[in-house]
Amino acid sequence: MNRPVHFEIHATDPATLSKFYADVFGWQITHMPQFDYYLINTGDNDGPGINGGFVKRMGTGAAAGAPVNAFVCSLGVASVDDAVAKATAAGAQIALPKMAIPGIGWQAYIRDPDENIVGLHQQDPNAK
């Protein structure tokens, strides 16, 4: 109980941003026109993870250089280096470069094309 069960990514243009996440992370997106909502299926239900949705951003995002004022999620990836390369090739920017979390793994943060911060996590007990 009290564990995350759904997430939402706010987007200026949900249709465009959903394509970025589908292309970079392989997510399946289903548009629900009656709600102007985009359901996100992040993968099969056999492993850890949750699904979510894209919602139209109401108003402007945070000012450039402002601290994050959000609930930031990290995505489990096979390779932080590969995920960062694929994301930046698709229009993301590096928010914080790859860093070791000793004995746990590697972490990096990107800023998607609509300025949302997303963590990328690669498990690696040998990370130093």
Give residue spans per PLM region.
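Core segments of cupin and vicinal oxygen chelate
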Residues: 1, 8-49
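N-terminal beta-strand motif that seeds the catalytic metal site of vicinal oxygen chelate
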Residues: 1-18, 70-75, 122-128
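Vicinal oxygen chelate
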Residues: 9, 30, 84-128
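Mid-chain, well-packed structural core segment of small domains
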Residues: 64-93
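A short, structured beta-strand/loop element
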Residues: 49-56
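Short hydrophobic/aromatic beta-strand element in the GNAT-like acyltransferase core
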Residues: 37, 74, 107-109
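Short, charged/polar surface micro-motifs in flexible loops or helix N-caps
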Residues: 44-48, 60-61, 79-81
